[in-house]
Design a protein with these regions (language model features):
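Metal-dependent phosphoester/phosphodiester hydrolase catalytic core
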Residues: 3-6, 18-496
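Hydrophobic helical h-region of N-terminal Sec-dependent signal peptides
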Residues: 7-11
């Protein structure tokens, strides 16, 4: 587990520079972040307020007494001042302290520090956390409660990494200065220009991510916990699909493909990831974390077919290429556990309007139709190729749950039993329990969802999940937690 490391700015002697020099120094505007750890390093992200080179130094301790120096790209307005560098050549299974500085033609920023752990090369205990759905439904950074404190709580669990299951922002939901609650209380928000209206331009989409990182808890989390990040719909607009044309008076730009292009670019600029490391240069990829764990990040948004009653003979949510990739990569994995990060749930019914559905399930409890046919193919192939120890993790529905899937209860039976765990939201409106479609035989072993009138983060229905893999036995334990870190549910799965 990671030791706590202070995130802060180094003091600069006043005598070292006059006022004119101070104004020309670059500034790190939104902290630092790490992502996608490997055995020899990770991606380091930062943002500058002016053109400047990204400089990263690493050390084994926070004293930075023996450093390695990495020179990254020039951060420019073309990418909204953001940039990243993949660190390589570091020892496996090691705590790495890093210090980020900006260099603008010799004028140096004050540094910011962070810490991460490289992935192990041998079997050892592994802890990850996951969740999603950040600052939605008008619930933003509330100064009355100290901001988005759930991020501080998650950082204190000392995970090796965090899977962000999507809805990293709510680009389609403005954040007002105040929000009246059903019980008469008032939720107050810190506000920004970008969050005053729905996002339509590239700069407005960028501003969604910038807003979240004005929260000190989130910046602390970013500096202490590496992330694997995927997207869902609200990085663009609710329930979107490729080719959609909006009938929505809030938008002057009706072409969702244009909005998605802006949302995609802003997402990749502002998250600690390298787009070129994804299979298609977008999201989906396999991340190995030692011999006990492989994570398969999915993109269930870019290739899905239009929202519909979802009862056609064949449908797609991953697309043939991604589905084939998932099957082959899982079959070739030698890791004990294969964790699939699906940004949309497998059996929860997610309506889009009165007749259409936007996720996998169509609500008829029968044999696979529509997008269910693609999942059926994947599950049957995993069974045929004897892929064992599979766990699916998701968010999206704004509550937490444990779902056990079994062919003994299912309309479609050609698959091995497995578990899917749901978590979220993070400082967003809490959701009510959704209906489970019986096609793949799910059973809700646990649900913690908001009752009517209890959607505010003040009401306690915010969640994250935690997975611990025992380095000796290889067993996997799932713990579903509330925003205070209280364990609501625990389940241990034995390796096969």
């Amino acid at each position: 587990m990671l030791r706590a490391a202070l995130l802060g700015l180094a003091a600069v002697p006043v005598a070292a520079c006059g006022p004119a020099l101070v104004t020309t120094r670059p500034r790190l505007t939104h902290g630092v972040a790490s992502g996608f750890p490997r055995t020899d390093g990770a991606v380091i992200w930062a943002r500058s307020d002016r053109p400047a080179a990204l400089i990263v130094e690493t050390a084994a301790t926070e004293s930075f007494s023996d450093t390695r120096r990495f020179t990254g790209p020039l951060l420019t307005p073309d990418a909204d001042g953001t940039g990243r560098i993949r660190l390589t050549g570091l020892p496996a299974d090691s705590e790495v302290h890093y210090r980020v500085t900006l260099d603008a033609d010799g004028a140096l920023s004050e540094p910011a520090t962070g810490v991460f752990r490289t992935a192990p090369a041998t079997a050892r205990d592994v802890r990850l956390i996951w969740s999603g759905d950040v600052a939605g439904q008008g619930f933003g950074i509330n100064p009355d409660i100290g901001g988005m404190t759930v991020f501080r709580t998650m950082a204190e669990r000392n995970p090796h990494f965090f899977i962000h299951s999507g809805d990293t922002v709510y680009a389609d939901v403005p954040i007002p200065e105040t929000l009246p609650l059903p019980d008469g209380r008032i939720w107050r928000n810190e506000i920004s220009e970008a969050k005053s209206a729905v996002a339509q331009t590239l700069d407005q989409y960028r501003g969604q991510h910038a807003y979240n990182l004005t929260d000190a808890n989130y910046r602390y989390f970013n500096a202490h916990v590496p992330q694997l990040v995927q997207w869902d719909d609200h990085e663009v607009i609710n329930n979107w699909y490729p080719g959609e044309v909006l009938d929505n008076d809030k938008y002057t730009e009706k072409r969702v493909d244009i909005l998605a292009r802006h949302g995609h670019r802003a997402f990749h600029e502002w998250q600690p990831l390298e787009a070129r490391e994804a299979v298609d240069g977008r999201v989906y990829q396999r991340v190995s974390y030692g011999p006990l764990l492989d994570v398969f990040l999915l993109d269930m948004r870019s290739y899905k077919d239009p929202n519909s009653p979802n009862r056609q003979q064949h449908g797609t949510i991953l697309g043939a290429r991604q589905a084939g990739w998932l099957i082959n990569e899982m079959a070739s994995s030698t890791a004990v556990w294969k964790v699939v990060a699906n940004d949309l749930p497998l059996a929860l019914v997610v309506p889009d309007g009165t007749t259409d559905f936007e996720a996998v399930a169509n609500g008829d409890n029968g044999l696979p139709l529509g997008r269910e046919t693609e999942l059926a193919h994947i599950l049957s192939q995993l069974k045929a190729r004897k892929v064992r120890n599979v766990v699916w993790l998701t968010a999206d529905v704004h509550y937490t749950a444990a779902h056990e899937y079994s062919p003994s209860r299912a309309a479609f039976t050609d698959f091995d039993p497995f578990w899917e765990f749901v978590s979220g939201p993070l400082n967003a409106g809490a959701g009510k329990e959704s209906t489970l479609d019986g096609t793949f035989g799910p059973r809700a072993d646990f649900v913690h969802a908001a009752p009517p009138g209890k959607q505010s983060p003040l009401d306690g229905y915010q969640h994250f999940g935690q997975i611990d893999i025992d380095g000796d036995s290889g067993d996997l334990t799932v713990t579903l937690c509330d925003a205070a870190g209280t364990a609501l549910y625990t389940r241990t799965l034995a390796r096969s």
